[in-house]
């Protein structure tokens, strides 16, 4: 019954994306080389692209005027974050993290510099995604209706606030590159029963063949595992108590710092440069995760009785 319900949910989610007729070469290449999609990744699925371009979604051929607010807002966000990226690249160059001068600093200063450097790097993605989102909305893609209100959030690739304030790896993953995440979920993850490590390795393979990608996503699977342990063993103890907010804040700090350590590997591409970058940071991300996981193994699960009382 559980398996039947699972496939039923998967089937219903996919219905909206079904392609009812085989696309012509013109339609296919028009979708593949659609400029807003090239700029920010394929933000929309072929079904939506086809329906908008052929006046099926908007039979009159006139696009809703309500989209202009979302177009201008995302355009402003895109320009703002790209400006932050340019400034950050000047004052926080990533290559400095590989130098002896960086390694000579205290661990606290190195960790802070690492975080700020890759915060600036993330701004590049924030900016490009928001520009691509703005152009897609201008073309009529991404309209959703929630509670009877039209919203232009259907092609959003990033929830910046949710990502930067996430207190777990799973929350950060859901907020980052959302359209690709949805595609991978529909086409791969929901069709398999493999573990979390497999999921992260598929993501690494999707990005490319640089060895550093597999270091990055391998560490990401460990961070996800650590988050699952804390959710099972710690979260029931603090939920609904005065410790809930400190727990979430500490979780956010851990995810952002270890996440920045992961990104250092990803953006160094070769194994040698990635390993050097981790070494210059004293392998703090790896040591922190392994020590945290071992410690969590020895913490007993919260009693069901105590959890029920708090709930």
What label would you give each PLM region?
Residues 1-311:
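Non-catalytic, membrane-anchoring transmembrane segments at the edges
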């Amino acid at each position: 019954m559980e398996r039947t319900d699972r496939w039923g949910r998967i089937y219903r989610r996919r219905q909206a994306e079904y392609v009812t007729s085989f696309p012509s070469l013109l339609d296919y290449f028009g979708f593949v080389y659609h400029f807003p999609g090239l700029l920010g990744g394929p933000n929309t699925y072929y079904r939506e692209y086809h329906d908008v371009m052929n006046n099926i979604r908007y039979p009159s051929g006139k696009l809703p005027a309500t989209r202009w607010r979302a177009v201008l807002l995302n355009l402003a966000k895109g320009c703002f974050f790209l400006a932050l990226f340019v400034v950050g690249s000047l004052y926080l160059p990533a290559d400095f993290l590989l130098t002896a001068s960086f390694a000579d600093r205290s661990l606290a200063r190195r960790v802070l510099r690492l975080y700020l450097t890759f915060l600036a790097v993330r701004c590049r993605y924030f900016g490009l995604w928001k520009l691509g989102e703005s152009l897609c909305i201008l073309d009529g893609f991404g309209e959703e209706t929630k509670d009877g209100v039209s919203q232009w959030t259907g092609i959003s690739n990033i929830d910046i606030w949710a990502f930067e304030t996430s207190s777990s790896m799973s929350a950060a993953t859901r907020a980052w590159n959302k359209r690709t995440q949805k595609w991978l979920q529909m086409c791969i993850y929901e069709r398999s029963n493999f573990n979390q490590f497999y999921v992260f390795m598929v993501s690494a393979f999707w990005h490319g063949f640089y060895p550093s990608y597999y270091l990055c996503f391998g560490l990401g699977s460990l961070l996800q595992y650590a988050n699952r342990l804390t959710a099972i063993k710690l979260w029931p103890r603090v939920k609904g108590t005065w410790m809930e907010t400190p727990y979430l804040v500490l979780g956010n700090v851990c995810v952002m710092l270890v996440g920045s350590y992961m990104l250092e590997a990803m953006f160094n591409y070769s194994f040698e440069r990635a390993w050097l970058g981790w070494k210059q940071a004293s392998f703090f991300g790896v040591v922190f995760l392994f020590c945290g996981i071992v410690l969590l193994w020895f913490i007993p699960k919260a009693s069901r009785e105590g959890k029920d009382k708090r709930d």
